[in-house]
């Protein structure tokens, strides 16, 4: 992704160790990893929303094309009913998409939450690996309940 080799990564870690010290370096690495994770999930959400919008637009275009080609006067009642169902499905998808809360603002708040959490992470880092696992499980539970 960033085209960073092992030597360059090792150099960055040594400089980070000298600048931050052995106590704050794990906290800084964890904070940066949280930011990267939040940004990746934000990008995935934006991509999913674009795909959903394109599918909705394609459905509406195909519906208009069918209406223009066939003409509603020549259709049987069964076909008219199926066309109405397609229209309702397209409208419900459009309404559902418009009623969703902005996923970008939610992810920005998660980024801020991770940025303001380094003090709690420092305590976890000094407590050992079992405390780190407990902290990760608690934060995962917290995220699930907030969704």
UniProtKB/Swiss-Prot annotation:
Residues 96-147 are annotated as: Disordered. The chain crosses the membrane at residues 1-21. One of its GO terms (cellular component) is TAT protein transport complex. Gene3D superfamilies: 1.20.5.3310. GO terms for biological process: protein transport by the Tat complex. It is a single-pass membrane protein. It comes from the Bacteria. It is found in: Cell inner membrane. GO terms for molecular function: protein transmembrane transporter activity. Part of the twin-arginine translocation (Tat) system that transports large folded proteins containing a characteristic twin-arginine motif in their signal peptide across membranes. Together with TatC, TatB is part of a receptor directly interacting with Tat signal peptides. TatB may form an oligomeric binding site that transiently accommodates folded Tat precursor proteins before their translocation. NCBIfam families: tatB. The Tat system comprises two distinct complexes: a TatABC complex, containing multiple copies of TatA, TatB and TatC subunits, and a separate TatA complex, containing only TatA subunits. Substrates initially bind to the TatABC complex, which probably triggers association of the separate TatA complex to form the active translocon. Belongs to the TatB family. This is Sec-independent protein translocase protein TatB.
